């Protein structure tokens, strides 16, 4: 909170203070113009750790693209053998369940291994001297370590979302040729959307 001396009320229009008001303090508050009006300039103190976000964002984008491409390819492969919408949908749903489970397990093992390697390296660097446990906890809080559970949930959920695109695209189309065209078109469009979402969430430079 800023307290302004009452003597400042006698300041001249150009912002200077008369000599007889020696004790007055002139504070300059930066302003910015918005639509021709002067407004106070404020700083955005909201800080987001994008390195931490990148841990689950990588798993999410990978899972979404994998679910989209793998399930769409599986459905088109089954459709080439049997041009039946029901067979394609059953194959796609089976691919969704199996793929989501596989991505979740694989992501958890991979990220947890990375977590253990980084923690082990931190212990070796600190030599675990006297007070090393406390220093290790402080260092772990300071550094951005991977979160296995977060990456697992992001990967499985986004794989399912990606797999739903070809499934929903083919669910209501009877003609085989039209069904394949719609699945391919929607899959290509979804790839662009997933890439755009990843760029926006990651705040990548334009």
From Swiss-Prot:
**Entry-linked InterPro entries:** Ccc1_fam (IPR008217)
Q: Note the Pfam families from the entry.
A: VIT1
Q: Which GO terms describe its biological process?
A: intracellular manganese ion homeostasis; nodulation
Keywords for this entry? Ion transport, Iron, Iron transport, Membrane, Metal-binding, Nitrogen fixation, Nodulation, Transmembrane, Transmembrane helix, Transport, Vacuole
Catalytic activity, as annotated? Fe(2+)(in) = Fe(2+)(out)
- Triggers of expression: No significant changes in expression observed in response to short- or long-term iron deficiency in nodules.
One GO cellular-component annotation of the UniProt record comes to:
vacuolar membrane
From the record, give the transmembrane residue ranges.
Answer: 61-81, 89-109, 153-173, 180-200
Topology relative to the lipid bilayer, per the entry, is: Multi-pass membrane protein
Q: What is its main location?
A: membrane
PANTHER family tied to this protein = FE(2+)/MN(2+) TRANSPORTER PCL1
Homology family: Belongs to the CCC1 family.
**Protein name per Swiss-Prot or TrEMBL:** VIT-like transporter 1a
Its taxonomic path starts at:
Eukaryota, Viridiplantae, Streptophyta, Embryophyta, Tracheophyta
Protein encoded by which gene: N-21
